[in-house]
Amino acid sequence: MSKKFNFFKEAVKNYKTSGTVVPSSKFLAKKMLKGIDFKAIKLVVELGPGNGAITHNILNKLPANSILVCFEINDAFYDELKKINHPQLIVLKASAENIKEEILKLGFNKADCIVSSLPLSIIPNEISDTILSESYAFLKQKGQFIQYQYSLSYYKKLKEVFGNNITLNFEPFNFPPAFVYKCSKN
């Protein structure tokens, strides 16, 4: 119970960066990760992992030779993520705006997949535009950018970057229900 209380407290205190007041459901995590060919993946990047609700699901699917790098700016969520003792997990206290710079420091050139829980529709446009363009540039060809949002308001922006290479899904068993955008870099 205390984990949920702490999440709620942090989320309310930092709503503009968390974008929610409850962790993602297991149903949303499953829908976001469905269709990813984990056998072929070397690097997954997670933006805004919060308390790790989706992080744990990614780690359970990663093959032994793969790495998950998480970007989290909230101190309390960062501390929670650092408690996950997993050899394939790297947690950075860094903004998603700096994805390329931070990942290059770790010795990687491109990401196979970027999974984002960032509230892009409420983050200032200049910042969300930078995050989206940097993410696109850092994806491998045929790489996936997977994003959930609670409305369709960000669809147009994703379409400007990914064109028609977007699949839209809906997950009703999340609070609030969420739209899942699966975007491919083709």
Per-range role (PLM):
Residues 3-36:
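Class I SAM-dependent methyltransferase Rossmann-like catalytic core
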Residues 41-50:
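Conserved class I S-adenosyl-L-methionine
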Residues 51-64:
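Conserved SAM-binding loop of SAM-dependent methyltransferases across substrates and taxa
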Residues 67-72:
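Conserved SAM-binding motif I beta-strand of class I
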Residues 77-105:
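S-adenosyl-L-methionine
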Residues 129-141:
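A short glycine-rich, Lys/Arg-flanked "PGG" loop and its adjoining helix->strand segment in the class I
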Residues 139-149:
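Conserved beta-strand signature within the Rossmann-like core of class I S-adenosyl-L-methionine
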Residues 170-186:
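Core SAM-dependent methyltransferase catalytic element
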